[in-house]
Amino acid sequence: MADQLNMNGLNLNGGEPRSYIPPHMRGKMGGPAPAGPPANLNGSAWAPQGNGYANGPRPAGGDSWANAPDFTPRGNGAPRGGNNWNPSGPPSFNKNAYGNPAAGAGGPGSAGGAGGAGGGAGQARGGGDGQWRDGKHIAGPANARLERELFGIADDPTKQQTGINFEKYDDIPVEASGQDVPEPVLKFTNPPLDDHLIKNIELAHYKVPTPVQKYSIPIVMGGRDLMACAQTGSGKTGGFLFPILSQAFQTGPSPIPANAAGSFGRTRKAYPTSLILAPTRELVSQIFDESRKFAYRSWVRPCVVYGGADIGSQLRQMERGCDLLVATPGRLVDLIERGRISLQNIKYLVLDEADRMLDMGFEPQIRRIVEGEDMPGVQNRQTLMFSATFPRDIQMLARDFLKDYVFLSVGRVGSTSENITQKVEYVEDIDKRSVLLDILHTHGAGLTLIFVETKRMADSLSDFLINQNFPATSIHGDRTQRERERALEMFRNGRCPILVATAVAARGLDIPNVTHVVNYDLPTDIDDYVHRIGRTGRAGNTGISTAFFNRGNRGVVRDLIELLKEANQEIPAFLENIAREGAGFGGGRGGRSGGRGRGGGANRDFRKFGGGGGGGFNGGGGFGGPPASGGYGGGGGFGGPPAPASYGPPPGQYGGGGYGGGGGAYGNPSAGGGQSWW
């Protein structure tokens, strides 16, 4: 039996029984130093060949590991004289060897000391990353496999390519307001962009900047705060990533506080220099993928954290380095409370889809992150807000986060792209499934995204389509993060070309080559409709949108007609008839006409137009002074008197233009999002 158990020369019969000595007791329990290697331990994992106990056999009655020297981990910086347990080397821990095998002892590329987890001054990281050395950015080696993963190949169907209408972006009107607005850039050139970033932009097959990028790059590179509104699919992500990464490549990492180094030379906390907040797990994952693409071969290490995923793997990712952090507000607050993230080095704060984050109730977390933790104040950081809509209530909130900012409005903000052909069909609820099958048979090619209002309907409709031999899948808030990521991946690569989704996928997701969006259930807010159909017609490509409309959706009929007119789309006669029937009886949230509406200045810089919210259609958000009638007007603040054409309630009472104003129905102003009782 003993012979059978003699593994790798580990003889179980020889020597005295060993006892475990805790690390803090080793070397303190007496006994002579060992004099030679034991005969029976050679070849085991704990004792390299010929050097089992470093300097000799364990004496009878000795202390086992008690006399071993201080541990020095393996690595090029470890002494080579006697392998890992040899006391001939220095007795203290060699920080350069741990976690950075490529670095020599004390070399400039070491990740030890304060430079470990937060972007130290001389960092070389695995996976072909670059490093910052002697005040210069040194790019890492090329990695063909990683390049294919990040950038794809020419005409790769899983990567978004610019479409036939991309050049038309030059015709989109741009309004930039603020003091000393810098001139736009027309090409990706140096200056202002770093050469390394330009190479990565070329790898991504981007030829010319979009309108939002033309203006945002010089604004951010000039050190200004920015509030940018641009229609969805217009390159907002590149609008903030390009200048942030370019300046990081030029200026290098920030020093980590001297007391930040923990045991074994690691910092337990991450000290990112850039923080990007977004509302959904899918959107932060998408921004993270883009940041990996443009930080390729650089010293910048992007990280992503979001709820619903394993926090342990996210912590391990941050320990390997975290310079640019993409996060959802909830998970970020959790990690701050755990003491794993410090915001004191933040140079750039980005709020993407800011209006949706506030709509989803993230305002307390955002205010805590920005104002209640150790983030530098508004004067000591750059803050950028990006979204497809920026109603006045969001602009008023932005005053707390931004300083002397430039307001950038690109195109008809909050509107839809003319690249999208919009069709509205009158379909009763009972007929929706059969009409959907007709559409799928007619427009079968390409990826089709179907939006429904409820999680149950998403699963039900997906199962129905599968039973009709259409390969479909679904995503909604009740599916686990792994299920959602798997469904999105199958949709992206075309294995399931039909995706049924709730609003969780409506905002910000950039799914390449979606050719058709179907609004099976129309939303009650026209802004949600804008973002849903914005999943197609991206980057200059064309797309089709079909909406199923019936009298249950009459709350958005006027906003829908206005939207179709703006985009030069055909307006069905039944829409105009229903709009005339309901004139003056506005329902729903009011959409554009309520607190978030066009009358609320959703795409205007409120600094230029005062706080006035009483003008326009049904008033607007913000504080526009007391209304002339003495009552509450407007959908979102102290607006003006009700519009004269809209059967407003008597002066001095709650109202906002129309019996459905204010929140949903006359006599029930708090019923936000509901249908009019009329």
Curated annotation (Swiss-Prot):
The lineage of its organism: Eukaryota, Fungi, Dikarya, Ascomycota, Pezizomycotina. Residues 641-652 have a biased composition (Pro residues). One of its GO terms (cellular component) is spliceosomal complex. ATP-binding RNA helicase involved in translation initiation. Remodels RNA in response to ADP and ATP concentrations by facilitating disruption, but also formation of RNA duplexes. It catalyses: ATP + H2O = ADP + phosphate + H(+). Residues 419-579 form the Helicase C-terminal domain. Its EC number is 3.6.4.13. This is ATP-dependent RNA helicase ded1. Residues 1-15, 73-87 have a biased composition (Low complexity). It is an enzyme of class 3 (hydrolase). It comes from Sclerotinia sclerotiorum (strain ATCC 18683 / 1980 / Ss-1). GO terms for biological process: cytoplasmic translational initiation; negative regulation of cytoplasmic translational initiation in response to stress; positive regulation of formation of translation preinitiation complex; regulatory ncRNA-mediated gene silencing; spliceosomal complex disassembly. The Q motif is unique to and characteristic of the DEAD box family of RNA helicases and controls ATP binding and hydrolysis. A motif (DEAD box) lies at residues 352-355. Belongs to the DEAD box helicase family. DDX3/DED1 subfamily.
